[in-house]
Amino acid sequence: MSSRPFESPPPYRPDEFKPNHYAPSNDVYGGDMHVRPMLSQPAYSFYPEDEILHFYKWTSPPGVIRILSMLVIVMCIAIFGCVASTLAWDRGYGTGLMGGSIGYPYGSGFGSYGTGYGYGFGYGYGYGGYTDPRAAKGFLLAMVAFCFIAALVIFVTSVIRSDISRTRRYYLTVIILSAFLGVMMFIATIVYIMGVNPTAQASGSLYSSQIYAMCNQFYASTATGLYMDQYLYHYCVVDPQEAIAIVLGFMVIVAFALIIFFAVKTRRKMDRYDKSNILWDKEHIYDEQPPNVEEWVKNVSAGTQDMPPPPSDYVERVDSPMAYSSNGKVNDKRLYPESSYKSTPVPEVVQELPATSPADDFRQPRYSSSGHLEPPSKRAPSKGRTGRPKRLEQDHYETDYTTGGESCDELEEDWIREYPPITSDQQRQLYKRNFDTGLQEYKSLQAELDEINKELSRLDKELDDYREESEEYMAAADEYNRLKQVKGSPDYKNKRNYCKQLKSKLSHIKKMVGDYDRQKT
């Protein structure tokens, strides 16, 4: 979709004018023609209604969070399997260390290198600032369990599309929980590295010399010929499954960091866009024909046929961001009351459409009872019928694409009569002054209209956060209804139409100036 529904008029850039030997000097233009370019930027040029966010897709930020949480679940299971497979070597199974060939002791904390070796060897490493391998593995398994539960909760709540997973508060909780688990998982992985690799923590330790002397035999390139105890071997050497667990631990940390990134991105989009712009479920375009169309054609006579819907109503339905979800309900709130589409139509032969063109002396085409389009006649537009309720503007923002093609052509003819093609530099300078004046008026008027739209969007988000019985909800609802009445007032509509008229005028002046500059060069 287009991200610029209410585009600003083309900017007038005096610096684009390239003077040559035919052009006059800068004195004709007041000496400031090339000093500072005049850029036209609308006050609120981006209209969020024109962009739809498909959050049900797996490539969207919530979808990426689901994928990452699923990967965390798989990696946690793999880490648990790798660490659990090495727990048997920490229980002291096996024979005495190196048999009885080496009988000298390595200190009371390590026990004796003889047949009397027992649990004192393992527990001795827990003292004197030394990390016990079993304690490191237990800490890592505990953090893996917490990460598994958290990732499972995130995945399940997002997959079942619960209401709580579609709020900004939910993603704030995901950010905080992921940050906490990521930090704790980083600490657990570092502790696990120190526990399964004793030489990594031996430097500066009380038992550094004994550990190096005991483990160097496993690092030597040639075998010593002695019988090695399997427990001591697995203690000194990092097993492949332990290395895999370390790598997966860091990958879990990276996954949590990415979850935080996409959760922040999701919250920003939810703050920026209206709820009606976000599709949490796969939409079904409501383009089916009315039910029992064939039966209706057979039974209804030509004289009593209902008139076809006016083009303005059709545009409102097509442009509306509302879509029906797969579970049969509307993705978001209803934009206008039920009475606006259940009112009893007043039968009449010819239906006049309300004028939406910026030109006040033109009217929209009308439809006869047979459904044929009658050519418009140039006369003052008549007021719309009071029996037919008129829908307010689409949600909070309007686009200017509902203007009829005939009125645009006729309005262009009016501007051509008022601003004919430029024939002299003095006339160009006059157009420049008119453009500057109109541009300032357009920006001021557009800023006033956009302020109402942004305030409505802000109140709409606040109403979703408040309880209906609270005083804050009632105050916000009153202000919301007041602004809706302001948008439905004739003064607002006149300003909006005049703003469109100014945009058309500025576009025409810009075109005339551009044509003249191209002819000069």
Curated annotation (Swiss-Prot):
Function in brief: May play a role in the formation and regulation of the tight junction (TJ) paracellular permeability barrier. Interacts with ZO-1.
Chain coiled-coil ranges: 424-488
Protein encoded by which gene: OCLN
Transmembrane spans: 67-89, 135-159, 170-194, 243-264
PTM annotation (Phosphothreonine): residues: 304, 402-403
Alphabetical UniProt keywords: Cell junction, Cell membrane, Coiled coil, Disulfide bond, Membrane, Phosphoprotein, Tight junction, Transmembrane, Transmembrane helix
Residues modified as Phosphoserine: 301, 312, 320, 339, 368-369, 407, 489
Protein name according to UniProt: Occludin
Taxonomic path: Eukaryota, Metazoa, Chordata, Craniata, Vertebrata
Membrane-side (Extracellular) residue stretches: 90-134, 195-242
Processing and modification events after translation: Dephosphorylated by PTPRJ. Less-phosphorylated forms are found in basolateral membrane, cytosol and tight junction. More-heavily phosphorylated forms are concentrated exclusively in tight junction.
